[in-house]
Amino acid sequence: MKHPLETLTTAAGILLMAFLSCLLLPAPALGLALAQKLVTMFHLMDLSQLYTLLFCLWFLVLGAIEYFVLRFIWRRWFSLAD
């Protein structure tokens, strides 16, 4: 039986891993020409909006990947449940 708060802890774990990614992993750096092209394509006001969206997506994706990797490792080698 699953714990009733498992979905909440999953979301919290992803956000925690995203925070750790912000501290430990490099963020993508775009060239000026590509950044201007993306700003125009997505109808943004300036580069700061683009980088805000880019960093949020980047770190949430990395956090989700880290969470699932750590969960797999935990369940595979360290979990005591049968």
Curated annotation (Swiss-Prot):
It is found in: Cell membrane. Coiled coil: none annotated. The chain crosses the membrane at residues 8-28, 50-70. It holds the Pfam family DUF1158. InterPro entries: DUF1158. One of its GO terms (cellular component) is plasma membrane. Keywords: Cell membrane, Membrane, Transmembrane, Transmembrane helix. It is a multi-pass membrane protein. The keyword Nucleotide-binding does not apply. This is Uncharacterized protein YbdJ. It comes from Escherichia coli (strain K12). The gene is ybdJ.
